[in-house]
C-alpha cells in the first residue's frame, strides 16, 4: 500500500513539473538555473566568470543560463552550412582563377599602358574588387582544413574584431565589395558617356578615381573604431554586425549605386532607341556585351538587396523560432532529438545570395575573357613578342609583326588615357568595351 502511494506521489510530481514547463515556455530561457555543466545538445555550456566579457568576444548566451548557441548558428542545419561553405570553395576557386587571368590580361604585365582608357581602369578596379571580396569570404583553398574554426575559433564562439584573422578578412571583404560596387556604377555611367560621345578630361577622371577610393577607404575603416566587424548568424564570413552600420556603411551606398545604374541603363537604351537602324546595329555590336554585363550584375545586386531587406524585416520572427526550439531542448533535455527547428531563412535563397558574388567572377570572364580583344592584347604583348618566341615560334612572331606594321602604315594613333575606347581614333589599339574589333563595323 505504501509503495503504491509513493508511486502515485512520484507520478503526480512529474506531471506537475511538466505542467509548469509547458505553461511558461520562457521559463528556462529567462531564469531557470540548470545543473552545473549541463546544456542540452546542440547547445554548449560555457563556464563563465565574466559574462559581459564573454559576450564581447562572441559568445551568445541564451537567456540567463550558461548555455550558448553553437557556431555556426542554428538558423541553418550543419548540413546546410556545409553546402554553402563548399559552394564558396568550389565556385570561389573557379572565379578566383578567372579574375586573376583577367587582371593579368588588362594590367601592364600584358597590356601596353599606352593603350589604357577610362574603361580599362574601371574594369581593372571592378575585377580587383570582386576578387578581394570573394577570396576573403567563406571557405578558400588555403583554409580547407580549418572547417568552421576560421569563423568559430572556439566551440560556441563567433569570431570578433579582436580576432586578427576576422578583422583582416572583414576589412578586405568590405573594401572589395564597395570597390566593385562603386566601379560597377562608374562603368555603367561611362558606357552612357561613351555612346553620347561626351569628352571627359584626364584630370577629371583622375579626380573621380581618387574620390571613389577615398569613399571606399572611409566606408571600410569607419566601423573599425566601433568594433563592428565580426561573424554573425547568417553570414559565411566576418563583416559588419549591427544593422545601423550595415545600412550606413554598405546598403545605403548599394541603394545609391543601384539608382545610378538603373538611370544609366535607361539612358543607354534611350540613346540606342533614338538613332537610325544602321547606327543602332553598330552601337549594339559594339556595346552589347558590356550592357548585358551591367544589367546582369544589376539583377544580382537587386536580388541581394531584396534578400537582405526581407531577412532583416523577419529578424524577430527568426528569433522567435530559435527561442521555441531552445525551449523545446530544455523541456526534452533527456531526448533533444525530438526537437525540430522551424523554418527560418530559406536555405536555397540564402545559398543563392552568397553565390551571386561568385557568379560575377565567371560572368566577367565570359564577357571580357573570351573575346578577340583579349587575344589581341596577349598577341601584342611582350610574352608573344620576344626573342624566344621569334626563335621557336616564328609563325606567331611574323603574324604579330605584320599586324603591327599594318597598324603603323595606316596612320592610326592610340586614344588618350582619359578617353573610353570608342571615343579614341584607334579602335584596334585601345580596349574595346565589347571585345569586338570596331574596324569591322565601320561603314
UniProtKB/Swiss-Prot annotation:
Keyword Zinc (UniProt): no
Top-rank taxon, per record: Eukaryota
GO cellular component, one term: membrane
Biased composition (Low complexity): 397-410, 419-432
Keywords: Glycoprotein, Membrane, Receptor, Signal, Transmembrane, Transmembrane helix
Induction: Down-regulated by P.aeruginosa, PAO1 strain and PA14 strain infection.
Membrane topology reported for the UniProt record: Multi-pass membrane protein
Main subcellular location of this protein, as a coarse class: membrane
Spans within the Cytoplasmic topological domain: 105-120, 188-203, 270-289, 372-443
InterPro entries for this protein: GPCR_Fz/Smo-like
Positions of transmembrane segments: 84-104, 121-141, 167-187, 204-224, 249-269, 290-310, 351-371
Extracellular compartment segments: 24-83, 142-166, 225-248, 311-350
Keyword NADP in record: no
Sugar-modified residues: 47
Signal peptide from the UniProt entry: 1-23
Annotated localization: Membrane
Family per similarity comment: Belongs to the G-protein coupled receptor Fz/Smo family.
Name of the protein described by the UniProt record: Frizzled/smoothened-like sans CRD protein E
Source organism of the structure: Dictyostelium discoideum (Social amoeba)
Amino acid at each position: 500500500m505504501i509503495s503504491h502511494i509513493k508511486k502515485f506521489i512520484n507520478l503526480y510530481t512529474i506531471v506537475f513539473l511538466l505542467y509548469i514547463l509547458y505553461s511558461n515556455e520562457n521559463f528556462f530561457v529567462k531564469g531557470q538555473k540548470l545543473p552545473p555543466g549541463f546544456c542540452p545538445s546542440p547547445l554548449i555550456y560555457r563556464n563563465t566568470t565574466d559574462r559581459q566579457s564573454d559576450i564581447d568576444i562572441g559568445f551568445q548566451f541564451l537567456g540567463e543560463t550558461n548555455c550558448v548557441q553553437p557556431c555556426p548558428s542554428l538558423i541553418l542545419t550543419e548540413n546546410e552550412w556545409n553546402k554553402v561553405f563548399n559552394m564558396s570553395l568550389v565556385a570561389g576557386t573557379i572565379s578566383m582563377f578567372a579574375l586573376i587571368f583577367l587582371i593579368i590580361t588588362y594590367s601592364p604585365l600584358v597590356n601596353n599602358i599606352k593603350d589604357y582608357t577610362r574603361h580599362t581602369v574601371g574594369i581593372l578596379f571592378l575585377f580587383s574588387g570582386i576578387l578581394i571580396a570573394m577570396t576573403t569570404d567563406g571557405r578558400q583553398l588555403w583554409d580547407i582544413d580549418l572547417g568552421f574554426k576560421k569563423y568559430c575559433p572556439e566551440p560556441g564562439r563567433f569570431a570578433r574584431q579582436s580576432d586578427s584573422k576576422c578583422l583582416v578578412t572583414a576589412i578586405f571583404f568590405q573594401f572589395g565589395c564597395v570597390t566593385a560596387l562603386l566601379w560597377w556604377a562608374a562603368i555603367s555611367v561611362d558606357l552612357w558617356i561613351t555612346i553620347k560621345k561626351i569628352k571627359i578630361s584626364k584630370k577629371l577622371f583622375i579626380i573621380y578615381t581618387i574620390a571613389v577610393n577615398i569613399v571606399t577607404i572611409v566606408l571600410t575603416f569607419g566601423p573599425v573604431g566601433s568594433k563592428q566587424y565580426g561573424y554573425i548568424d547568417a553570414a559565411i564570413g566576418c563583416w559588419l554586425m549591427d544593422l545601423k552600420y550595415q545600412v550606413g556603411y554598405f546598403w545605403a551606398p548599394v541603394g545609391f549605386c543601384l539608382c545610378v545604374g538603373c538611370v544609366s541603363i535607361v539612358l543607354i537604351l534611350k540613346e540606342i532607341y533614338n538613332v537610325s537602324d544602321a547606327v543602332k546595329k553598330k552601337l549594339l555590336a559594339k556595346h552589347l556585351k558590356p550592357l548585358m554585363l551591367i544589367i546582369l550584375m544589376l539583377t544580382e545586386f537587386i536580388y541581394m538587396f531584396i534578400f537582405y531587406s526581407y531577412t532583416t524585416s523577419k529578424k524577430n520572427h527568426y528569433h522567435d523560432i530559435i527561442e521555441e526550439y531552445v525551449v523545446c531542448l530544455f523541456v526534452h533535455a533527456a531526448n533533444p532529438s525530438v526537437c525540430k527547428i522551424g523554418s527560418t531563412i530559406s536555405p536555397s535563397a540564402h545559398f543563392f545570395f552568397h553565390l551571386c558574388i561568385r557568379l560575377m567572377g565567371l560572368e566577367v570572364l565570359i564577357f571580357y575573357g573570351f573575346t578577340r580583344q583579349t587575344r589581341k592584347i596577349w598577341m601584342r604583348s611582350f610574352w608573344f613578342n620576344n626573342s624566344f618566341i621569334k626563335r621557336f615560334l616564328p609563325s606567331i612572331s611574323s603574324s604579330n609583326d605584320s599586324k603591327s606594321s599594318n597598324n603603323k602604315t595606316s596612320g592610326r594613333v592610340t586614344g588618350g588615357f582619359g578617353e573610353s575606347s570608342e571615343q579614341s581614333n584607334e579602335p584596334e589599339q585601345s580596349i574595346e568595351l565589347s571585345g569586338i574589333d570596331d574596324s569591322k563595323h565601320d561603314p
